[in-house]
Amino acid sequence: MFDQAILNNVLGKGFDFMGIADSPKNGQDKRYNKIKSFLLKSNFSGFTKDDLFIMQFIKKGWGHDIAALSNMAEAFMNFSHSNPAKIPEYQQLLSEVVFRALHPKVNPYKKDIKNVKYLGKYGYYLEHLNIILGCYQKICGNEYIELNEKICKHLIANSFQYENFHADLLPHVKMKWSADQAAILYSIWLYDENNGTFLGKNLTQKWLHWMKTYGTH
């Protein structure tokens, strides 16, 4: 068991990529440069304890690797709107995010996901990958649109298997979290927003109705 102080520190800093702390503006610049350096580093073979704070204590990192990459992708997408002059740089960095998200050291299938016929009960990984692919399409192009659509349809079908409209997050784990389902729905909305489709409309309506009726107190 962890010492409680250590555990609290892990939970408080788990997503703190490379553990950077400083004044807001200075800290943001340092964080961006650290992340940029990480993404442009060659020979990626998975995250290390020097990349993710939580891995100093938990070897596999509780899935913080794909979540950290998802956060990076959203940041680059947002930066492309606020600072369009640097879009080429953000496109390059987002391409590196996708490469790492699909890497066998990050994806739970341990092989090229394009060769995986059934995506299974890996909703946690897929929700973040789907967000990454949506961000990529938004500012880079359609290279991964087929995979993006495949994941959307898989998550929708899996969600509809349950009366509470919550997709599976991990194999052999029955627990579901509404925050993750909201992220799943957001990832599908991002695909719809990019492509003028309505794949997630029905599921979103049913999930919101279920949450309003049974999921709040």
Regions found by a protein language model. Name each.
Residues 1-2:
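Acidic, serine/threonine-rich, charge-biased low-complexity segments
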Residues 5, 9-10, 14-15, 19-58, ...:
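Long, well-ordered core segments of solenoidal/helical folds
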Residues 68, 76-182:
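Extended ligand-binding groove/face enriched in aromatic
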